[in-house]
């Protein structure tokens, strides 16, 4: 299956491209959801949505394409879908994982780890990892964050899709 990408900007200035490898063989429903949301038009997927929460030394969160503040988003299967499995772990920086509000509440929100986060294992479904753009793009995004998660600039997915 194809890898996915985000072209990210900070306050309208291009930061670069992040490329994700997705674990289709381990969590096919979860990766199908993410891949389709990368291909959908603005308002129906990730294109033109923002990263609403960035906490340095922890993670970068996005995927709320309906409200833009962490309260919304929806999966291609309906509002929410189940935790597929927890086979993959948060073992390093650059892991791509589903954000949720408890068991079996996956929608469209996701996060990228910027360190090991083993306390999230068994609670959040890891479905991919960053394979390009970590040092240039993800690190620059992390620098805009704060302990509260509020960002000092608008981090936007200008374009996204599959490669």
UniProtKB/Swiss-Prot annotation:
InterPro entries: Cyclophilin-like_dom_sf (IPR029000), Cyclophilin-type_PPIase (IPR024936), Cyclophilin-type_PPIase_CS (IPR020892), Cyclophilin-type_PPIase_dom (IPR002130). Its EC number is 5.2.1.8. Pfam families: Pro_isomerase (PF00160). It catalyses: [protein]-peptidylproline (omega=180) = [protein]-peptidylproline (omega=0). Transmembrane segments: none annotated. Residues 5-162 form the PPIase cyclophilin-type domain. Keywords: Cytoplasm, Isomerase, Rotamase. It comes from the Eukaryota. GO terms for cellular component: cytoplasm. One of its GO terms (molecular function) is peptidyl-prolyl cis-trans isomerase activity. Binds cyclosporin A (CsA). CsA mediates some of its effects via an inhibitory action on PPIase. It is found in: Cytoplasm. GO terms for biological process: protein folding. PPIases accelerate the folding of proteins. It catalyzes the cis-trans isomerization of proline imidic peptide bonds in oligopeptides. Belongs to the cyclophilin-type PPIase family. PPIase A subfamily. This is Peptidyl-prolyl cis-trans isomerase. It comes from Uromyces fabae. The gene is PIG28.
């Amino acid at each position: 299956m194809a890898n996915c990408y985000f072209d990210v900007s900070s306050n309208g200035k291009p930061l670069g491209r992040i490329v994700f490898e997705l674990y289709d063989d381990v969590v096919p429903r979860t990766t199908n959801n993410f891949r389709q949301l990368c291909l959908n038009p603005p308002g129906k997927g990730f294109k033109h949505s923002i990263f609403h929460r960035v906490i340095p030394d922890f993670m970068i969160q996005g995927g709320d394409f309906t409200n833009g503040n962490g309260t919304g988003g929806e999966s291609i299967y309906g509002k929410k879908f189940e935790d597929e499995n927890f086979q993959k772990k948060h073992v390093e920086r650059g892991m791509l994982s589903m954000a949720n509000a408890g068991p079996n509440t996956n929608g469209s929100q996701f996060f990228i780890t910027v360190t090991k986060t083993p306390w999230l294992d068994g609670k959040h479904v890891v479905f991919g990892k960053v394979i390009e753009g970590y040092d240039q793009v993800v690190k620059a995004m992390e620098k805009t964050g704060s302990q509260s998660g509020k960002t000092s600039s608008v981090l936007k997915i200008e374009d996204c899709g599959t490669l």
